[in-house]
Structures are given as structure tokens and as C-alpha cells.
Regions:
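A short alpha->loop->secondary-structure connector
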Residues: 22
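Conserved non-cysteine loop/helix-boundary elements of the Radical SAM core domain that shape
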Residues: 1-18, 26-160
């Protein structure tokens, strides 16, 4: 894992050098495309330090926190400390039977808890990811997902 962190930091530094060379200002940063919060917290902090140290004009900084089992208070506090203001909570579905079928390690209740923690910790924009077309998923399941979205009021919703 350490080599992965080193490679990510090197990529951040290389991109920052190119941005300086071509006078490009990065205003939006997205760390995701997976679940970066599953990395050891020291590795997460190393990546956050690299971003914060190389890009000082960030207006929107997103981290894909993914599953509730990877983003406890310590991780969320770390993200806020570095200025992350947009977070993606990715329940994928709000039906426990489908989460179990997918092998997800969280419960539906954990998503509600994580969403509430994110709000309390000051994340100004919360995105939620859902997947349409899961095995055994019904139209009623998707309807229920959207009803929950309406209750929680995330600023963004992504449906894959």
C-alpha cells in the first residue's frame, strides 16, 4: 500500500508542476473512482497533504467516502481538517437484502448515521451514489431509494 500512496503523491506533484508550467489553476479536486477512505488513515493524510500543498485555489474538494464502514468520525474529521467540503456517500441501494447480496459490509442504518455525521461535521455538499439494475432490484426498490433521497436532501445524486 505504501508504494501506491507514493505513486499517487508523485502524480499529484507532476500534475501540479504541469499546472504551474502552463499557468493553469485547479479549482475543483475529486479524490475517488473507488473508495479512498478504505486506505489507512496515514496514507489518506499523506494524499490530502499533497493536494493541499500543491493546489491552493481549491473551491470544491470532493472525496468519495463510499461505504459507511470506511468513513468513521476520525476519517471525516481528517477530511474536514484539510478543507474537503463535498463528500460522496455511496450506499448503492437502501435495501438491506440487496446490500447483503452485493456483499456490502454496511447496514442501511449505517448510511443514515453517516449522512447525519457528514452534516454535523460541516460538509456543505453531500452526494449520494446509487446503482440501478442491480440483481434482483425492482422498480419499487428504486422508488424507495428516491423517497429516502427526498427525506435526506443531499445536494447531488448520482445514479449508475
Amino acid at each position: 500500500m505504501d508504494q501506491f500512496i507514493v505513486s499517487v503523491v508523485r502524480d499529484i506533484q507532476d500534475i501540479a508542476a504541469l499546472c504551474r508550467q502552463y499557468d493553469i489553476q485547479i479549482r475543483s479536486v475529486y479524490i475517488g473512482g473507488g473508495t479512498p477512505t478504505c486506505l489507512p488513515i496515514a496514507g489518506q493524510e499523506t494524499i490530502l497533504q499533497a493536494v493541499a500543498g500543491n493546489f491552493r485555489e481549491i473551491e470544491e474538494w470532493t472525496v468519495e467516502a463510499g461505504r459507511p464502514d470506511t468513513a468513521g468520525e476520525e476519517v471525516l474529521a481528517l477530511l474536514r481538517r484539510y478543507g474537503v467540503n463535498r463528500i460522496s456517500v455511496n450506499p448503492q441501494t437502501m435495501q438491506q437484502r440487496l446490500l447483503d447480496l452485493l456483499g456490502r459490509r454496511h447496514r442501511v442504518e449505517d448510511v443514515f448515521d453517516m449522512f447525519s455525521r457528514c452534516r454535523k461535521m460541516g460538509f456543505s455538499v453531500i452526494n449520494m451514489d446509487f446503482i440501478a439494475g442491480l440483481p434482483e432490484q425492482t422498480q419499487a426498490d428504486m422508488q424507495e431509494n428516491m423517497e429516502i433521497v427526498c427525506q435526506l436532501h443531499p445536494e447531488n445524486v448520482t445514479i449508475h
